[in-house]
Amino acid sequence: MVLHPLRGSSIDIHPNARWQQTGITVAGGNRQGNGINQLSKPCGLYVDDDQTIYVAERVNHRIVEWKRGATSGQVVAGGNGQGRGDHQLSNPSDAIIDKERDSLIICDRSNKRVVRWPRRNGTSGETIISNIDCVGLTMDENGSLYVTGFEKDEVRRYRRGESQGTVVAGGNRYGNRLDQLFAPNYVFVDRDHSVAKQGIVVAGGQGEGNDLTQLSYPEGVVVDQLGTVYVANAGNDRIMRWPKGATQGSVIVGGNGSGEQSNQLHFSAGLSFDRHGNLYVADQENHRVQKFNIEFNG
């Protein structure tokens, strides 16, 4: 079962949309490092309406902002060494924007907390959820947070002001039943907000592999207005599209073996679209973010 966050505004993508097969590096790409023009194992990815990219850098313990066309980024959270201080992060895995409060909300994974950090000129964060081994999170339009609990194999919803939250997926020990999850990474919430006792497999579920019916280490996921599922299939170094009700997916970018060429990926983690339908991928082991421009969108 695959779950992941809504990234920015909802997207309208034509069912026959195609993307350029060669990506453009829009963040990092200057080898692994902690310079402002470098990334180190980018994972969670958020693209704002103006195509500004926010990247969670696990190894550098920071969140960086890369504006459209920039050759270097700006640290907007963390970056003060690994630690538990209010001004520090430890292996952050995801970050989203709360536009209403003009702040970042960050999965500070190794500190087992979710923190809110002022988006502009913030020097420290505020812990809003404690004691949670979170990997991914998202927010619906009502301001409720959905956070994955990796250790407890569950997803919890936190309405505004709540500190405990409610289990909305999994929470029945780890396993492969439809009412179970196994080490969930990222979570996506659509506009339906329905909560069910059992899930429905919408992609994969046929064992690990590289057939079009299979996934291997699925990471980032986005769902469009038609219910089409887009999956960062990290273990196969490709991005796949699964139309609603489909029994197999199709490769939309990557799938050319693991590598650092512009048509290749190496453990694709985060996944996002901008409002035009252009695709962004956190290419983790290449320490870069790749943009694949949309060629056709109806």
Regions found by a protein language model. Give the residues of each.
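Blade-level signature of beta-propeller repeat domains, shared across WD40, Kelch, NHL, RCC1
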Residues: 266-298
